[in-house]
Amino acid sequence: GTVWLNIGDCYAGYSGNTGGATGSDLRGTRNTTVVKTGSNLKKRDLVGVPWVAAFALREAGWYLRCDIVWAKPNPIPESVKNRPTRSHEFIFLLSKNPQYYYNMDAIREPLAKPVGKKVNSRGERLIVGNPKGKNSRDVWWIAPKPIRGSHIAVFPLDLPKKCILAG
């Protein structure tokens, strides 16, 4: 079997005086983790939580099979002025064994051109393209579907569905 892991990342910060700001006045403190003394992280460093977790799982015996970029066409706005707005997360495909079930046909993507015939340089006719579609790529463009009255960060159901179908 497989495990599909999605963990959000955060930025390093420091605990301490917030200048009297509270609640929603703490701009930029969302997705922030406190830096411990002696850490090699600096304030405002991207921590890399997904990769730290993936490498720790690999050290624990898991096979790190693939990193998939979940590209978000409509990400949550960020009020940052010193870096681009984050519009992706990582999904890691892991397995406990080198041989595992993976159903590539279940998540194939449509072909740009229909399956057809082509003539090669020797005049032989070849069938081009898999009629089931092309193999899934490692960048998945999946947007959440808005739900009235719901939380702003709606998790798209198509994301776990694709993982479940594949493995």
Regions picked out by a protein language model, each given a short descriptive name:
Residues 1-167:
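Core catalytic lobe of class I
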